[in-house]
Amino acid sequence: MPATQEVTRVRTPRRENHEVLATVSSLLGSKRVTLQCMDGVVRMGRIPGSKNKKMWIHEGDVVIVAPWDIQDSKADVIWKYTRPQVEWLERKGYLK
């Protein structure tokens, strides 16, 4: 029997929407987190109400964020990666 490969579909940040990868540094409460973004900026992230109950975020999680146009020090959390997706991102060189 040949070994089957598991296919992992991973959403990557979209450059046209100015999305970046980030790691959650700390939880601030009230749907807010501190993020260490891959572009070198520390941002205050906001979890939108539509994703609040669906997406449980903890320290150390890797997420996609969209920085605000008005204030670059703040961002909205768009997507949270699972552990197999984070491993795939590391293998492909998206995470440093």
Swiss-Prot record:
S1-like domain residues: 8-82
Domain of life: Archaea
Listed GO MF terms: RNA binding; translation initiation factor activity
InterPro entries per UniProt: NA-bd_OB-fold, RNA-binding_domain_S1_IF1, TIF_eIF-1A, TIF_eIF-1A_CS
Record-linked SUPFAM superfamilies: Nucleic acid-binding proteins
Gene giving rise to this polypeptide: eif1a1
Phylogenetic placement of the source organism: Archaea, Methanobacteriati, Methanobacteriota, Stenosarchaea group, Methanomicrobia
Coiled-coil stretches: none
Keyword list, A-Z: Initiation factor, Protein biosynthesis
Task performed by this protein: Seems to be required for maximal rate of protein biosynthesis. Enhances ribosome dissociation into subunits and stabilizes the binding of the initiator Met-tRNA(I) to 40 S ribosomal subunits.
UniProt KW Protein biosynthesis keyword: yes
Name under which the protein is recorded: Translation initiation factor 1A 1
Keyword Protein biosynthesis: yes
Species in which this protein is naturally found: Methanosarcina barkeri (strain Fusaro / DSM 804)
UniProt-listed HAMAP family: aIF_1A (MF_00216)
Residue ranges of the TM segments: none
Family: Belongs to the eIF-1A family.
